Amino acid sequence: MRTLPYSESVDSPSAPDPERARGGTETLPRAYLVRSQRERLLEAMLRVAAAKGYEATTVTDVIEVAGVSREAFDEMFESKSACFLEAYDAVFDVLVAHVNSAFESAAGQPWPERIAAGLSALVGLLSIESGIARMAMVEVTAAGDEARARYRAALARFTPFLEEGREYSNQGEELPADTARFAIGGATSMIFDEIRAGRGPELKRILPDLVFAVLMPYLGPEAAEDEMRRVVAASSP
């Protein structure tokens, strides 16, 4: 299974690997060194923010975990927020790609079943990477206006998966223009509540509810409930 970037041991920040430390790096090409340092800083930001929360995270925390100097950090990022946002974008790149892979793997199936496959992939990955899931879905709301705008833009990247819903729906063009945004908002609010309550590892439990929330605006309550029951039956032992 594909995992989120920099996701190893995110439950608690760890000391840097001695081989990553600054000593002995002078002979490496500068382009390689800068790239390596940047990746380590992004990894450290994810680890620390997942463990401590964004507000409690400091640049000192990040550079200590990364094994990178403050000078190097300042050369690459103008602030803690800038580092966080770049790491955040990397996380959502993987989330969207993971959903897309599941959606495309179900090609040939009815649209509601492909939606269920994509949602199953999403909650499966988030439940495994619950620390980073908290950073991506909850801590981002504490990271300032730009981060919240980035969060809204990230959620909008799931809209293309819902476009076929208009063709599949009996209501068709009568559906409001913001139907996809409302459907995504309803589903992500449930995910947010579960993660904030500390139930990130149990996200698969709400998969049927997520399927209903996304499909209901397009199919109506009865058809969406039928699909929800199908998901429950498919996941039963």
Which residue ranges define each predicted feature?
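Hydrophobic alpha-helical connector segments
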Residues: 86, 100-128
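Helix-turn-helix
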Residues: 48-82, 86
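Basic, helix-initiating cap at the start of DNA-binding domains
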Residues: 1-52, 61-65
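Pre-recognition alpha-helix immediately N-terminal to the DNA-recognition helix
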Residues: 40-48, 94, 117, 121
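Short, structured motif recognition centered on aromatic/hydrophobic residues
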Residues: 54, 95, 132-136, 187, ...
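Amphipathic alpha-helical packing segments from all-alpha helical-bundle domains
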Residues: 145-168, 177-189, 204-213
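Alpha-helical DNA-contacting segments of helix-turn-helix folds
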Residues: 36, 40, 77, 82-94, ...
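C-terminal peripheral helix-coil segments that are non-catalytic and often amphipathic
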Residues: 1-25, 124, 128, 160, ...
